[in-house]
Amino acid sequence: MANVTQWALRAAATVAIASASNVYASCGVESGKVSILSNDFPALHAVANMAETCASDKVTVTKNQTKDHRNLQVAALKANPAKYSSAIVSTSSIVPLLNEGLVRPLDDLVAKYGASLQPSQLIRVDGKVMAVAFMANSQHLFYREDILKLAGVEPPTTYDELIAAAKVIRDKGIMSNPIALNTKTGWNLGEEFINMYCATGGDFFKGNSAQPNINNPMGVKALNTLKALTELSNPDYLTFDSNVTQSLWEDGKVAFAVMWGSRGSAILDDEGSEPDIVASTRLVSTPSLEKGGLPATTLWWDGWTVSKNLSDADAEATFKVMVKATSTEMMKANSEKAVWLIEGYQPNDAAKGVIDSVQNKARPYPMLPYMGSLHSALGSELSDFLQGKESAEQALKDAEAAYTASAKEQGFL
């Protein structure tokens, strides 16, 4: 699967995609029930809105777009029939569904109705198509060019440079808390550590085992860098998720932010912010920990699945609707909202940070069945260190212990 993902991301980054040749003129669905569970941001709004165009007196299409989608998906898809016929997933959120056997192989449906899909979109697990990817994503750096010029500092390419620049901005009284990251306790905080650790080049696990491998000098460096950034952030940084960070940016309260590329179009549009802020916003690759090093981020894909606990008729209807929802027609109408992995996509300014990170060889998020357990442990165990209550080594030891308990419970260790 990693090879498919990297190929797709590379294709988006190099724009090696031809014009569309096979677009559904209509959804081709005569009857059925389609219900979509997804995260809540503009690119996914576009997908769901296109899906809703397939609704008729015999076809129902409903959606639940919420930031709590991860917490809902397993229980919702365990129901029989499943509460949602399609969960829109990412590199990590598909793993619990695969572990529980809650999504169906799509090979037969791809053969019958997937002529418009590119091979690079087909996410395979053990040789079977289990999801259809439609966009690439990563977290990367947003900076305010006007604030940097006012402070007399250059755009940073490493985190040491970013921290030094932020200190100048603070010391000159330009901004008191010039940095924002998605450091909310839980999934977001865990992801920030994973991003930093990826930049060290270290492996999260020992060899081919599920034994954790983060309590080491690379883990300490990642944590210390994260702490230095939070010391230049607002004191309530442990509440910052994507919505909060975007709001801080649009309100002109920060000079640097690490946000998801999928937020780029909303940041650069003419809504929710002032024209001077938008005009001076720059999207670039995530900084590295050292000159010429790997970007401190992970590469992701977003895609759709079809639930296992459905009638074959509703599964077929869902597949056809989701093909329409992620068609070239949808992409062309919303090209600025994501780095689409859809035929015919041409990148724009909002895609620059993701593409730069890909070209700088950012690592894919590890698609391992036990990575979610480590991610959760990191999200719950690192805040004490950031608040000065324990050492980096102790925080990493606690995270490894929490992960080990979870991994043993699930049979990974």
Residues of each region from the PLM?
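Conserved N-terminal structural module of periplasmic/extracytoplasmic solute-binding proteins
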Residues: 6-13, 23-95, 155, 238, ...
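Conserved C-terminal helix/tail region of periplasmic/extracytoplasmic solute-binding proteins
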Residues: 28-33, 58, 149, 332, ...
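A structural signal for short loop-to-beta-strand junctions that line the ligand-binding cleft
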Residues: 75, 83-85, 113-148, 177, ...
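Hinge/lid segment of periplasmic solute-binding proteins
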Residues: 91-138, 154, 163, 192, ...
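Short, solvent-exposed loop/beta-turn-alpha elements that line the ligand-binding surface or hinge
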Residues: 104-120, 179-184, 200-221, 270-281, ...
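Extracytoplasmic/periplasmic substrate-recognition and gating elements
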Residues: 129, 150-151, 220, 224, ...
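Extracytoplasmic/periplasmic solute-binding protein
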Residues: 130, 139, 163-211
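Glycine-centered hinge/linker elements that transmit conformational signals in sensory
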Residues: 166, 209-238
